[in-house]
C-alpha cells in the first residue's frame, strides 16, 4: 500500500500574526510587561518633565490652583478674580466659581490638604493621571486586541507629546482624559445594571472636571437603546441616575449661591468670538446681553462662527496630533470586518467623536477638547498598522514574513516616538527660564510674577482690590482680590459702584497678549493718570513693564 507523503514542517503556512505572537511571548512574559511599561513611562515622563519649566505657569492653571486654595482655607468653591460681567450677578469677594466646574479644584484641594499649598502639589494630579492612564490603557487594549498590539499602542501612548504636555501642567486635561477613558472602559464592558450605574457615575464625575457631557447624551442613550441585552427602560433610568449622583450637589450649590439651579456662563461662551462680540470682549463689559435678542438681530453670526470653528477644529487636530497616527487611525475607521466586541468599541467611539466635533464648534475650536479621545485613536491606529502589516507580510515569501512584520511596525513606532525622544535629548529653552522649555499655555515666568507681586505689596495693602490685565498672577501668586480690566476706561467708574476699584495695574504683557481698548494702551504709553487715580507708580523688569494707578484717598468713602 502506498503511503501518503506528509508535507515538510517547514512548508506549513503560518499566519503572520501567529508568528508575531510567538515572537512576543518568546522573549518576555505578559506578567512582566506592566512593570516594564511603567518603568519606560517613568523614564520618558521624567525626561520630558526635566526639560520643561515646572511651575503653575498658565492662565487656567493659576485659576484652578487659586480656587483650590480658597477651598482649603474654608472660603468655599470661589475665586479671587472677577470679570466685569460678574457685577450683574455678584457683589462681593470671593466670587462663587461657575466659570469652571468644581471637580478639578476639589481634587487639587485634596492634594493641598495632603502636601500643603504649593505649585508642585497643584500639578500632582496631572502627574499621577499619566501613569494610571498608561496602566489602564494597556489592560483595556490587551483585552480586545492582541498582546503585541497592546504593547505597540501603549508605547505610543507613553511617547505621545500631547499627553505628556498636559501631564506636567495644572490643567484639567490629564485628569479628565483619565476619567473619560475609565468611563469608556466601564461603559463598553457593562453587562449589568450595576455596571451601567457605575458608568453613569463616572460620566457625571468627569462632567464636574470639564463640562463636556452635553455632546454625549444622544450617542450614549442611542447606544444603550440598541446594545446591551438588558431591559431598555431600566438601562436608561440607571444610567441617568448614575450621572445625577455626582452632579446633584453642584446643582444644589448653584441654587444656594445664585438662586438658580442651573446658573451658567454658557450664553456668553456662545456669543463670544463673533463679529458683535469679538474675542472675549463680552466678559469685559458690564452689559448682560440677551441671547434671544442676539439670535434675533444677528443670527448669521453664530452660523459663521460655527463654520469657522469647524474648519479651525480640523486644523487644530491636524497640527497638534501626529500625522502618521491620524493616517492609520482614519484607515482603521474604514475597516469593519471585525469581531462584534471590537465593532461596538468602534461604533461608540465614532459616535462620541463626531458628536463632540459638531457640538463643540458652537463654542470653540481648540484641540484641548479632543485630547481625551487620543488614547482610543492610538489604539485604532495601532490595530490598523498591525492588520496592514499582516496583509503585506502574507504577500511575500515565508522566510521574509517576520522581517516585513517587524519592519512595518518598527517604522510606525519610530515615526511616533522619535519626535518626543529627540525633543527630550536635544532641546533647551531660553536662558531666562534656566534653559528650560516653557510648559504648554505658559504665561509668564514664576519669578517675574513674584517680583510683580512684591511691587504691589509694597505699594498697596493686601485687602485692596486691583483691576488689571494680568489677573491670574494677582490671584495665585499674590493671593489678593482682583478684576479683569474692562474694554472701556469709563466702565471702571461704573464697576466701582458695586465692586471696589482700589487700584489699576496695566502691563505691556497683558495688552499684547489680550488686546485692550486703545484708551488703556495710550494710558500705559503716556505719563497721564485718570481722574480719582492720580497716584502713579511704574514697574520695570523683564519681560514686564507695568503702570500702577492708585485711587486717591480723599475720593474713597
What are these regions, as identified by a protein language model?
Residues 1-48, 142, 232-242, 406-411, ...:
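Start-transfer (signal-anchor) and selected internal transmembrane alpha helices
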Residues 45, 234-314, 318-328, 415-426:
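Membrane-lumen/periplasm interface segments of specific transmembrane helices
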Residues 33-39, 155, 201, 217-218, ...:
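Signature aromatic-anchored transmembrane alpha helix within multi-pass, membrane-resident enzymes
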Residues 162-175:
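Short acidic/glycine- and proline-prone juxtamembrane loop motifs at membrane-interface regions
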Residues 134, 225, 305-343, 350, ...:
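Hydrophobic, aromatic-rich transmembrane alpha-helices
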Residues 121-145, 178, 182, 331-334:
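Transmembrane-helix motifs of polytopic, lipid-linked glycan transferases
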Residues 406-470:
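Membrane-embedded, lumen/periplasm-facing catalytic core of multi-pass transferases
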Residues 142-145, 183-198, 206, 225-226:
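Membrane-interface transmembrane helices that cradle and orient dolichyl/undecaprenyl
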Amino acid at each position: 500500500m502506498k503511503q501518503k507523503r506528509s508535507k515538510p514542517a517547514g512548508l506549513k503556512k503560518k499566519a503572520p500574526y501567529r508568528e508575531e505572537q510567538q515572537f512576543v511571548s518568546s522573549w518576555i512574559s505578559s506578567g512582566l510587561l506592566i512593570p516594564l511599561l511603567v518603568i519606560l513611562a517613568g523614564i520618558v515622563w521624567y525626561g520630558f518633565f526635566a526639560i520643561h519649566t515646572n511651575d503653575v505657569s498658565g492662565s487656567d492653571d493659576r485659576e484652578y490652583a487659586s480656587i483650590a486654595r480658597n477651598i482649603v482655607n474654608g472660603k468655599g468653591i470661589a475665586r479671587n478674580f472677577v470679570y466685569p460681567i460678574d457685577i450683574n450677578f455678584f457683589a462681593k469677594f470671593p466670587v462663587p466659581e461657575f466659570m469652571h466646574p468644581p471637580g478639578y479644584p476639589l481634587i487639587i484641594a485634596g492634594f493641598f490638604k495632603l502636601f500643603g499649598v504649593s505649585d508642585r502639589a497643584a500639578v500632582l494630579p496631572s502627574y499621577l493621571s499619566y501613569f494610571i492612564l498608561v496602566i489602564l490603557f494597556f489592560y483595556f487594549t490587551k483585552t480586545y486586541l492582541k498582546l503585541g498590539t497592546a504593547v505597540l499602542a501603549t508605547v505610543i501612548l507613553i511617547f505621545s507629546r500631547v499627553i505628556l504636555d498636559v501631564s506636567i501642567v495644572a490643567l484639567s486635561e490629564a485628569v479628565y482624559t483619565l476619567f473619560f477613558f475609565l468611563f469608556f472602559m466601564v461603559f463598553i464592558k457593562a453587562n449589568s445594571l450595576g455596571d451601567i450605574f457605575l458608568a453613569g457615575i463616572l460620566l457625571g464625575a468627569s462632567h464636574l472636571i470639564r463640562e463636556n457631557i452635553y455632546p454625549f447624551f444622544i450617542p450614549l442613550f442611542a447606544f444603550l437603546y440598541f446594545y446591551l441585552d438588558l431591559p431598555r427602560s431600566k438601562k436608561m433610568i440607571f444610567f441617568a441616575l448614575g450621572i445625577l449622583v455626582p452632579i446633584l450637589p453642584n446643582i444644589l450649590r448653584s441654587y444656594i449661591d445664585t438662586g438658580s439651579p442651573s446658573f451658567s456662563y454658557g450664553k456668553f461662551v456662545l456669543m463670544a468670538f463673533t463679529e458683535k462680540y469679538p474675542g472675549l470682549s463680552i466678559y469685559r463689559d458690564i452689559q448682560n446681553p440677551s441671547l434671544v435678542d442676539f439670535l434675533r438681530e444677528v443670527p448669521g453670526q453664530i452660523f459663521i462662527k460655527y463654520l469657522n470653528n469647524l474648519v479651525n477644529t480640523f486644523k487644530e487636530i491636524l497640527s497638534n496630533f501626529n500625522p502618521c497616527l491620524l493616517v492609520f487611525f482614519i484607515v482603521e475607521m474604514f475597516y469593519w470586518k471585525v469581531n462584534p466586541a471590537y465593532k461596538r468599541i468602534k461604533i461608540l467611539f465614532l459616535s462620541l467623536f463626531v458628536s463632540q466635533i459638531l457640538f463643540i464648534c458652537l463654542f470653540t475650536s481648540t484641540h484641548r477638547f479632543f485630547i481625551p479621545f487620543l488614547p482610543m485613536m492610538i489604539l485604532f491606529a495601532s490595530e490598523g498598522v498591525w492588520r496592514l502589516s499582516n496583509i503585506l507580510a502574507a504577500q511575500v515569501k515565508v522566510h521574509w514574513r517576520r522581517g516585513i512584520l517587524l519592519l512595518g511596525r518598527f517604522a510606525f513606532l519610530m515615526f511616533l516616538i522619535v519626535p518626543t525622544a529627540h525633543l527630550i535629548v536635544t532641546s533647551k529653552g531660553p536662558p531666562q527660564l534656566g534653559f528650560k522649555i516653557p510648559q504648554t499655555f505658559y504665561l509668564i515666568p514664576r519669578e517675574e510674577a513674584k517680583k510683580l507681586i512684591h511691587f504691589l505689596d509694597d505699594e498697596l495693602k493686601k485687602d485692596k482690590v486691583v483691576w488689571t490685565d494680568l489677573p491670574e498672577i494677582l490671584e495665585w501668586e499674590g493671593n489678593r482680590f482682583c478684576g479683569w480690566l474692562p474694554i472701556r476706561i469709563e466702565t471702571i467708574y461704573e464697576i466701582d459702584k458695586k465692586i471696589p476699584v482700589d487700584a489699576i495695574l496695566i502691563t505691556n504683557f497683558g495688552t499684547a497678549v489680550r488686546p485692550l481698548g486703545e484708551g488703556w494702551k495710550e494710558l500705559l504709553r503716556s505719563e497721564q493718570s485718570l481722574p480719582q487715580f492720580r497716584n502713579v507708580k511704574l514697574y520695570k523688569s523683564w519681560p514686564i513693564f507695568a503702570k500702577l494707578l492708585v485711587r486717591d484717598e480723599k475720593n474713597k468713602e
